Swiss-Prot record:
WD repeats lie at residues 17-56, 59-98, 101-140, 143-182, 185-224, 227-266, 269-308. The gene is POC1A. This is POC1 centriolar protein homolog A. It is found in: Cytoplasm, Cytoskeleton, Microtubule organizing center, Centrosome; Cytoplasm, Cytoskeleton, Microtubule organizing center, Centrosome, Centriole; Cytoplasm, Cytoskeleton, Cilium basal body; Cytoplasm, Cytoskeleton, Spindle pole. Interacts with POC1B. The keyword Ubl conjugation does not apply. It comes from Homo sapiens (Human). PROSITE patterns: WD_REPEATS_1, WD_REPEATS_2, WD_REPEATS_REGION. One of its GO terms (biological process) is growth plate cartilage chondrocyte development. GO terms for cellular component: centriole; centrosome; ciliary basal body; cytoplasm; spindle pole. InterPro entries: G-protein_beta_WD-40_rep, WD40/YVTN_repeat-like_dom_sf, WD40_repeat_CS, WD40_repeat_dom_sf, WD40_rpt, WDR55_POC1. It holds the Pfam family WD40.
Length: 407
């Protein structure tokens, strides 16, 4: 039986209903619904099932800047230039709860993987964490010195990453509320950031037309792509962790192969800046939005044939190590074209001929898992030390109390 062949991405359908630029898109967990927000102050929930009417939610008093489905799919969060966050029930009634979240535009909202909390980012320079069901503010992270464009939880909920107009990406520990590291390599405002599905890496998009990928354990810059001719407005990891898609003001979407560090496709669909992009939870589809007021849904196709069985577990992108000198700053040539064309750039990966790709990938995965184990052991040791210190302090306090009580 012949193996299935990967195909080019294809435009499945497009939704028209917004009356101004589309700012954000997100799929529900079961891919039955797609939410989008717009500068027209409305939130739309589109049904992937043909002939189904969309829901138009009105409640925000200004542009809707961000949207995110809860992990269960039963709730939908949106943020706005009206400084509020609304939690909606995505059904025909469109009921919502309002959070007076920030003192300036809310740029980003994202649920934790357990759905119990969500994080927001704002032009008031803060990142805030909220309890979903108790509708309660929990804490604020405030070391950025300019607008915060985006904030996301790590897959395990332990870390938060934020991107700002202060040209930094900051990594935070949720439990200690401390900034773990600041990444300062961007040459302009950082517009978007997200975690790799494995939780070991982050990717950030910038106004300097670049996309950068860092390891959150070593804080090393792993990959640097300069493929767009204008600002990169959004990005999304494929659930396998092998691909990354970007949306840019140059009107294109670009799909990157992270394992080989190369450009796979350039997609022309939007007339004007592509403002947002997101994969579905399975990776079978991705959606994009633009200043042309359109929401487009694409079928991935290219992920049918993947990099072997090891892709069942998401793993971080290959490091540039030896090829650091030639992959960063490389602007891959893209053939000219317009409309619904899909263009593939053939670029041979620079890998040792003697080592099979599957073996290399497997070894990378093993090394990644060892790093995670090492980090886990280190955390356990720290907790044990902390417990011992507290126990020692308790014993000393008890002895002091007994001494004072003795006549």
């Amino acid at each position: 039986m012949a193996a299935p062949c990967a195909e080019d991405p294809s435009l499945e359908r497009h939704f028209k209903g917004h009356r101004d630029a589309v700012t954000c898109v997100d799929f529900s967990i079961n891919t039955k619904q797609l939410a989008s927000g717009s500068m027209d102050s409305c939130l739309m929930v589109w049904h992937m099932k043909p002939q189904s009417r969309a829901y138009r939610f009105t409640g925000h008093k200004d542009a809707v800047t961000c949207v995110n489905f809860s992990p269960s799919g039963h709730l939908l969060a949106s943020g706005s230039r009206d400084k509020t966050v609304r939690i909606w029930v995505p059904n025909v009634k469109g009921e919502s709860t309002v959070f007076r979240a920030h003192t300036a535009t809310v740029r980003s909202v994202h649920f934790c993987s357990d759905g119990q909390s969500f994080v927001t980012a704002s032009d008031d320079k803060t990142v805030k964490v909220w309890a979903t069901h108790r509708q309660k503010f929990l804490f604020s992270l405030s070391q950025h010195i300019n607008w915060v464009r985006c904030a996301k939880f790590s897959p395990d909920g332990r870390l938060i990453v934020s991107a700002s107009d202060d040209k930094t990406v900051k990594l935070w520990d949720k439990s200690s509320r401390e900034c773990v590291h600041s990444y300062c390599e961007h040459g302009g405002f950082v517009t978007y950031v997200d975690f790799h599905p494995s939780g070991t890496c982050i990717a950030a998009a910038g106004m300097d037309n670049t996309v950068k990928v860092w390891d959150v354990r070593t804080h090393r810059l792993l990959q640097h792509y300069q493929l767009h001719s204008a600002a990169v407005n959004g990005l999304s990891f494929h659930p396998s962790g092998n691909y990354l898609i970007t949306a840019s003001s140059d009107s294109t979407l670009k799909i990157l192969d992270l394992m080989e560090g190369r450009l796979l496709y350039t997609l022309h669909g939007h007339q004007g800046p592509a403002t947002t992009v997101a994969f579905s939870r399975t990776g079978e589809y991705f959606a994009s939005g633009g200043s042309d007021e359109q929401v487009m849904v694409w079928k991935s196709n290219f992920d049918i044939v993947d990099h072997g069985e090891v892709t069942k577990v998401p793993r971080p992108p290959a490091t540039l190590a030896s090829s650091m000198g030639n992959l960063p700053e490389v602007d891959f040539p893209v053939p000219p074209g317009r409309g619904r064309s899909v263009e593939s750039v053939q670029s041979q990966p620079q890998e040792p001929v003697s080592v099979p790709q599957t073996l290399t990938s497997t070894l990378e995965h093993i090394v990644g898992q060892l790093d995670v184990l090492t980090q886990t052991v280190s955390i356990l040791e720290q907790r044990l030390t902390l417990t011992e210190d507290k126990l020692k302090q308790c014993l000393e306090n008890q002895q002091l109390i007994m001494q004072r009580a003795t006549p």
